Amino acid sequence: MNKFSKLALVGIVAAGSLAIYASPSFAAEVGSTTSKADITFKNDDGTTPTNPVDPTNPGDNVTPTDPDAPTPTTGKLRLDYVSNIHFGEQTISGSDTTYKAKYDEVLQSDGVTKKYVPTFAQVTDNRGTNAGWKLQVSNDQFKAGTEELTGAVLTLKDATLNSANVSKPTNASTVILNGNSLTQDVVNAPENSGMGVWTNAFGKTIGADETSENASVTLRVPGETKKAADEKYVTTLTWTLTDTPD
């Protein structure tokens, strides 16, 4: 008797459970309507340069401290910034010698804290056409007055592209400038790449300070080249941005 009652009770509970799950509820629709969202775009007027960003952390704006920083270009496709390159004072040597550049000093977004970043160039493409672009560079020979630093070779290597965007262009890992004014490719952004803000930096910056030297930006001077003491030798690098990628 007890066994039968127990089984009957279990059967009743199970049946009750099935009854509960077999009773779905339906929401009664009483009406619907539609709404819209819209946006209208206007052209970037191209008159306001984009702030330079940290080439090692492109989400942060920086302010270069070099008083002779190059003038940015204007337009919807523009060259925002290029580092000057400083090798400082060096002792004359009669042997072939390679000199390393200083890092580029910038102020972080607080306007106070200094940071030392690799030599870099920054391009902004706000055209909205996704047509691509190309950055090239050339230079003349280092000179002090009319005296050339014959045979001097400027090398920019270990290039790294950086951006908050993902449509990555391609870059030359090494750029060699012989002072012959021949144009060298730096960055090529084919169609559907290179939109927004992009930096191309030469070298790394971990732990750099005002005394650090960047082994990725070098000047090689032959030992047999004449060198005048207390004279500053200067080369002009011409950076050219075009809207005709490869």
Language-model features and meaning:
Residues 4-8, 20, 24-246:
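Signature of Gram-negative chaperone-usher
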Residues 11-19:
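Bacterial N-terminal signal peptides
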